[in-house]
From Swiss-Prot:
Binding, substrate: T33, G34, S35, T36, D89, G90, A91, D92, K102, G103, G104, G105, K129
Organism per entry: Ruegeria pomeroyi (strain ATCC 700808 / DSM 15171 / DSS-3)
This protein's name: Ribose-5-phosphate isomerase A
Pfam families to which the protein is assigned, alphabetical: Rib_5-P_isom_A (PF06026)
Database matches in NCBIfam families: PRK00702.1 (NF001924), rpiA (TIGR00021)
Gene name tied to this protein: rpiA
């Protein structure tokens, strides 16, 4: 039941439900990856089944694609869509300029490609994801498997000259083996603690041989929908400079997501 969800899960639910209202008939929608984005996919699936919403989704990972199909969303590829009306995704951190750290779910490469191929990117989050300065959450960097330890050493050497507090890179694991992305790559998590110049860091990291992409999303996000455990929602639009307040009531039948609770 909805009442059994934690305040954080309630916050994710109301943010996802409010963001789903931004999707209109005929839209091509980028579908993010991760626990928060999964709530959004379920909300959209509910609208497809119960309200007849006509939309097509471009998933950013195989597991998002599987979930989208399960809830009745028509799934197409980005090349089939060519361009997207909106992408809705979660974030590991966002700052006051709506710059993001993403990739905690391991899909940062496809997430960034899909987000930049969209007219607008909307992030759904709980208030705990907001930070004054990025960097407390480890920054994911996707690297090719060949020579990943050399790439790791190059990353740590590069960080010496960057405005960050920490400079350790660790290989993300999946049990006893390295985590493998949908594209067959590894992820190195950079433990930076604080990032002084995120824009500069994003550019520098991608110049290192072996690096495919990093999890800094700079000037990509247009709107963040922040959910609260009591049903309050804030919609912050960085382009319009506006903050809209809303409130969603919890109804027990609304909770389609007990299996997604963290």
């Amino acid at each position: 039941m909805t009442g059994e969800l934690s305040p954080i899960d309630k916050a994710k639910f109301v943010a996802a439900k409010r963001a789903a209202d931004l999707v209109e008939d005929g839209m091509r929608v980028g579908l993010g990856t991760g626990s928060t984005a999964a709530w959004l996919v379920r909300c959209l699936g509910d609208m497809v089944r119960k309200e007849g919403l006509k939309m097509r989704g471009v998933p950013t990972s195989t597991r998002t694609a599987q979930l989208a199909r399960e809830v009745g969303i028509e799934v197409i590829t980005l090349d089939e869509a060519r361009w997207l009306d909106i992408t809705i995704d979660g974030a590991d951190e966002f700052d006051g300029d709506l710059n993001l750290i993403k990739g905690g779910g391991g899909a940062l490469l496809q997430e960034k490609i899909v987000a930049t191929a969209s007219d607008q990117m909307v992030v759904i989050a709980d208030l705990g994801k907001e930070v004054s300065r990025l960097g407390a959450f480890p920054l994911p960097v996707e690297v090719i498997p060949f020579g990943w330890q050399t790439t790791q050493a190059l990353l740590e050497e590069t960080l010496i000259s960057m405005d960050v507090l920490g400079r350790t890179a660790t290989l993300r694991m999946n049990g006893d083996t390295p985590f493998v992305t949908d594209e067959g790559n590894h992820i190195l998590d950079l433990h930076l603690q604080r990032i002084g110049n995120a824009r500069q860091l994003a550019l520098v990291l991608n110049q290192i041989p072996g690096v495919v992409e990093n999890g800094l999303f700079i000037d990509i996000c247009d709107t963040v929908v922040v959910g609260h455990g009591d049903g309050r929602v804030e919609i912050r639009d960085i382009n319009q400079g506006t903050v809209e307040h809303d409130r969603l009531d919890f109804v027990e039948s609304d909770n389609l997501f007990t299996d997604l609770a963290d």
